[in-house]
Amino acid sequence: MTLAPTFIARGLLAALMLIASPWANALVFAVNEGVTYRVPLEEVRGRYAAIAADLSKILKQPVTVEPVGDYNLLRRGLASKSYDLAMIHPAHVSIQAIKGSGYKLVAITKGYQKYTASFLVQPDSKLNSLADLKGLKLGAPDEDSITSWMVRATLRDAKLDPAQMSITYTRYQDAVPFFVENNLTQAGATAANALVKAWQTKGGKILAQSKPVPIKHILASPNLSADQIEKVREYLIGLDASDEGKKKLEPTKYTGFEKYDEAKMLELGAWLGL
């Protein structure tokens, strides 16, 4: 069957309109909320809708929110520069993108500047320092979580080789105290403040803590101009300065954003082993 010329012309016109549409050149704002948190991806999309709408106006280009739950998928997107903007929970993935793909640190999230891993032990534990963990079992969150990257760096600071230790990794941080309580491990590491407080309330001890590391970073692709990046930074940092901005922040559950020295971030990357 031969297609009518009019039908073909309409098809070509539709294709040309799609190419010319601003949505064909939409900027992608990837959002990752961490590997150990149970947040549905569609819920993540809704949380950032108002901010994405503002960014569309500021950059004069549509901005679409793309939730990314898997770290390896996130890494691939950053490596290929598929994401123009990215909200990244784990510091190690951010640092890898800055070092390897030329991304720029735009801002970090207030309230998450000093993310710290705590090593939990039983109230009657005879352990006095991290060095005492040699030859013992340690519970920790997902192996690729920022918490576990921090845990391994802290163990190295204590002259312990993580590769030669018995570390039991678990998908969720709230399983770590269970390991210690039930003597499945002699210590457990978590960076969840609620878990640490609950542990101490029950009489549990904190054996040691890691260096603090800021998490939940906003990065910008090298495909964006310096002017565009600065506009995004000014917008994000100024969000909590007005009632309207605070309202837009509410769905994200964050209080605001602030600047952070990219060089300091890279120094932390060296400590993490990147």
Model segments located where?
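Acidic, polar ligand-binding/catalytic clefts
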Residues: 68-132
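Extracytoplasmic small-molecule ligand-binding "clamshell" domains
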Residues: 27-94
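Periplasmic-binding protein-like
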Residues: 31-35, 111-121, 200-236, 240, ...
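A ligand-binding cleft/hinge motif common to bilobed small-molecule-binding domains
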Residues: 90-100, 152-153, 157, 178-209
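Bilobed "Venus flytrap"/periplasmic-binding protein-like clamshell domains
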Residues: 37-54, 91, 115-178, 182, ...
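Alpha-to-beta junction loops
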Residues: 79-88, 136-138, 181-190
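N-terminal signal peptide c-region/cleavage motif recognized by signal peptidases
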Residues: 19-24
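Short helix-initiation/N-cap motifs at beta->coil->alpha
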Residues: 65-76, 165-178, 213-214
